[in-house]
Amino acid sequence: MYRVNVSLFIKAQEYQLLDNFLRTTLVPQLRGDEGVAQVDLLEVMAQAPVVEIAQPMDDMVLALLISLEQERDLEYYLSEVLCERLELLGKTFGERVLYHVTPMRQIAL
């Protein structure tokens, strides 16, 4: 299993607008993309000491976790599909929502 984490950095006051955009536009598109097995949205907890040091208290960090079954899906997804999806995010929110993409591979335990 391969995953792509898209960390979304927002001001707390932007949360409702972003949440609506994610639920009505971006997540349905991601779920419909070929090779995508699952899409999850998580909030990075503000209580974590590392997060508090890295950001002011009025900021939020969300993690959009996209699961892909195969490595070939990951490579294509990163280079072709996800760029287009994130371009829409950028056009909609500009610098009010910043993001960082981290591709990951699951390690069997």
Located regions from the model:
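A general secondary-structure boundary signal
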Residues: 25, 39, 63-67, 102-107
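Glycine-rich beta-strand-turn "strand-cap" elements at beta-sheet edges
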Residues: 40-57, 86-109
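Generic detection of intrinsically disordered/low-complexity segments and helix-coil linkers/edges
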Residues: 9, 15, 68-71, 87, ...
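Short amphipathic alpha-helical segments
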Residues: 14-44, 81-91
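Terminal low-complexity, poorly structured segments
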Residues: 26, 70, 74, 82-85, ...
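Short, well-ordered beta-strand segments in beta-rich or mixed alpha/beta enzyme
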Residues: 2-9, 42-80
